[in-house]
Amino acid sequence: MGLFLFVLLGGLLFFLLEYMTQAEDWVSFSGSPHLYNSSNIGCGTITDRIGNVLLDISQGRTYSENGNTRKSTLHWLGDRKGYISASTVSTYAASMVGYDRINGVYNASDEGGNARLTLSEKVQNAALEAMGNRKGTVGVYNYKTGEILCALTTPTYDPENVPDIAND
């Protein structure tokens, strides 16, 4: 009986330690049908450094109204089909769904969380215009704080107007 209790308590302790250190990863696991639909997380918004909404995924996937902003942030926010992965969404998934260790993902207000990036919509769009039709990358950061102000990769496309490349 003593060995059984020892193993039981050891297993419980192991589970609690794993829960305390890994719960955020468990919650934001992309296979969770409670949070994801069609490989997209089901709630929250992503804004730039001053609060401009870049992506709202509380009801589907709504991008910025500005076409240049949609193009310049595509590689950060991904597309609807998952052809370009959404690294920002993956990184901030737990906070966007409103997860905390006490309540889990339960949210009485039924609103998602907000992820505020250090990116600047203005700088992203200026970099996109400066790149024109050239291929490459633009990166701008604040060396004092480490904040990324701009990270642009071209070529890019507007996720609201996906090009047909079947005949290319």
Predicted regions and their residues:
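Periplasmic/cell-envelope proteins involved in peptidoglycan metabolism and beta-lactam response
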Residues: M1-D168
